A protein has these predicted regions:
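Distinct, well-ordered alpha-helical segments
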Residues: 74-81, 99-112, 131-136, 157-164
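Short, flexible/disordered intra-domain loops and linkers
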Residues: 36-41, 99-105, 183-194
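Canonical Radical SAM [4Fe-4S] cluster-binding loop centered on the CxxxCxxC motif
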Residues: 1-45
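Radical SAM enzyme [4Fe-4S]-AdoMet core and its adjacent flexible, acidic
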Residues: 125-246, 258-259
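Acidic (Asp/Glu)-rich catalytic clusters
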Residues: 53-56, 84, 106-115, 135-142, ...
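Core AdoMet radical
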Residues: 13, 31-43, 57-72, 85-102, ...
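Alpha-helix-loop-beta-strand connector modules within alpha/beta enzyme cores
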Residues: 79-90, 138-141, 214-216
């Protein structure tokens, strides 16, 4: 970085890459290659880094991703227990069918931690890339939930309404996501040539837009269910002039990698 840096207001989001792999191979995942060799991964060092980040930004958000955070509930519990209540905690998961962990065990985990977890972001895509848990299981998750759906390349737009109808019985909000590896400052707020946005506007009720220079959300509603179309830039820092006239590198995200 060539300028003095500072975190965004409220502190940068701290994303923790869990030190264990998932069994998925989603085509848009850029993290999978990092799990090809798990030597050097360290839960203890990650716990140390979590404590450091808490001391620096005691109100920042923590996001757990991977990998599959729910693949090792004991390790995930240790990480959650290290984070004080001043932070919001988000977990990105496929809530998958797993050989070593039952749905009942995963649901019990959400019950034990429902006061810790701000939201569990559950991947459910139009195309099936993993063995998913039944939708009825998602309706039993004790903590707040949101469905995440990456609309990847030639997605089947004619299935969008049926997809949303699928989750109406559980009243779980849905976030459609643009492939962030293809997001640029030039297309972040592009509307006319954004096929996904135009499909969503055609099928659902558009409610408005919010965002910043780093990410945004186009909001929709369908039969009382809230949906968002989310776009974000694939990097963590932007250059911005502060109110004091100084140009800063604004840090939006801090990564804690698998080795801590």
């Amino acid at each position: 970085m060539t300028h003095p840096y500072k975190t965004r207001e409220g502190g940068a989001t701290v994303t923790v890459f869990v030190p264990y792999d998932c069994q998925n191979n989603c085509p848009f995942c850029i993290n999978k290659k990092e799990y090809a060799d798990c030597s050097g991964f360290s839960l203890d060092k990650i716990l140390d880094s979590i404590r450091v980040m808490d001391s620096i930004t005691p109100r920042c958000d923590f996001v757990f991703t991977g990998g599959e955070p729910l693949a090792d509930l004991n390790a995930l519990q240790r990480m959650l227990d290290t984070i004080p209540a001043t932070h919001k905690i988000y977990i990105n998961t496929t809530f998958p069918a797993q050989a070593a962990t039952t749905f009942e065990e995963m649901l019990a985990f959400t019950e034990r931690n429902k006061d810790k977890i701000t939201c569990m972001n559950i991947s459910r895509h139009l195309q099936h890339y993993v063995e998913e848990s039944p939708d009825e299981v998602l309706g039993k998750i004790a903590c707040p939930t949101r469905i995440n759906c990456v609309l990847y390349r030639n997605y089947p737009a004619d299935r969008l309404v049926d997809y949303v109808e699928r989750f109406l019985p559980y009243r779980i909000p849905i976030q459609f996501r643009y492939d962030y590896t293809e997001t640029t400052p030039e297309n972040l707020y592009e509307e006319d040539n954004d096929r996904i946005l135009q499909d969503l506007k055609r099928l659902f009720t558009y409610k408005g837009l919010d965002g910043c220079r780093m990410r945004n959300g186009f909001h929709f509603e369908y039969k009382g269910l809230h949906m968002t179309y989310h776009k974000t830039l694939p990097y963590s820092t932007i250059v911005e002039k502060g109110d004091d006239g100084v140009t800063y590198d604004i840090l939006y995200d801090i990564l804690i990698k698998q080795n801590g």
